[in-house]
A protein has these predicted regions:
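Catalytic domains that recognize anionic headgroups
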Residues: 1-287
Length: 287
């Protein structure tokens, strides 16, 4: 299973209260392959996740990947490899006989093409994590004896940085509307005399990540009922600027846009978790 936290930057993830994910393991600071949702997911759907420079399998693709396309001779083997004619890992899982389902919050997933086209089962929800979890659980129950690959793009950490349990969520406008920086347009650079870090918006993103920890707890509880091992990658697709160097939003280069969390772990058959990459490699059956 691949779960992306849209716009979640590494420092916001670290600040969030997330008892589930913190108990699972420590997220690595990874570097996104792109500065916005479409390009980052296009990369991940080719098997290229955000990159970590430490010499750890699955985190550093130069050591070993979770999954990859068989595009070059001599590459180190991945946990699962797909032929090029599958078009990407989603088509690869379908061709391999997996029950494949996905759900996306961001508008890039609204239309059938291009990010969704390989999914036989997909629901665009907008920012609604509870609905997304419900959808994936229903798809999980439909898999019968087939292996399963699930994808979730959670949108709560993306502007307007809101979730359905946040007080005053309807009034939150985010980086494209009236926020603390007073209607500064998205991706605009302010003169240095006006630079300031918008801690209020950053903390709203922190709160959204805390909220998603609980929703992932709901998801993993349901998956665990079947006592089937599930290998899971959770990562940010890109980060966000909250006023650093006079910049807001994403879709352009800045270190805070490239720094994202990544955590790879396994939900074991007995309901426990492991983030030991060697155990994952030995025991994993990607589900």
């Amino acid at each position: 299973m691949l779960i992306t936290l849209d716009c979640a930057r590494f420092d916001a993830y670290n600040e969030a209260r997330k008892p589930l994910l913190d108990a699972v393991g420590k997220a690595r600071q990874a570097y996104s392959q792109a500065t916005y949702t479409y390009a980052s997911h296009a990369s991940m759907f080719q098997g290229i996740l955000p990159h970590v420079f430490s010499a750890e399998p699955f985190y550093n693709r130069g050591i070993r990947q979770l999954w990859r396309m068989r595009d070059k001779v001599g590459k180190k083997p991945a946990l699962i490899e797909f032929p090029l004619d599958t078009g990407g890992i989603i088509g690869g899982f379908v061709q391999a006989g997996y029950h494949v389902a996905g759900t996306g919050a961001m508008s890039w997933f609204r239309d059938p093409k291009p990010l969704r086209e390989a999914f036989p089962n997909f629901e665009f929800t907008g920012i609604d994590a509870k609905r997304q979890v419900s959808y994936i659980v229903k798809q999980w129950k439909r898999k019968a004896t087939r292996p399963f690959f699930g994808f979730i793009n959670f949108g709560e950490p993306h502007g307007p940085y809101m979730h359905d349990e946040m007080a005053g969520a309807a009034e939150v406008k985010g980086t494209t509307g009236t926020a603390n920086f007073r209607e500064r347009p998205h991706a605009a650079k302010l003169p240095s005399t006006q630079w300031s870090f918008d801690e209020k918006l950053w903390r709203q993103q922190v709160d959204c990540i805390s909220y998603l920890d609980a929703r992932m707890g709901d998801l993993f509880t349901e998956l665990g009922r079947d006592k089937v091992g599930v290998t899971i990658a959770v990562c940010g697709d890109h980060g966000e600027c909250f006023g650093e160097d006079g910049l807001y939003g994403h879709g352009f280069y800045h270190p805070k846009i490239m720094e994202v969390p990544m955590l790879i772990f396994r939900l074991n058959e007995d309901g426990s978790f492991t983030d030991d990459v060697n155990q994952i490699a030995e025991r994993a059956c990607l589900s």
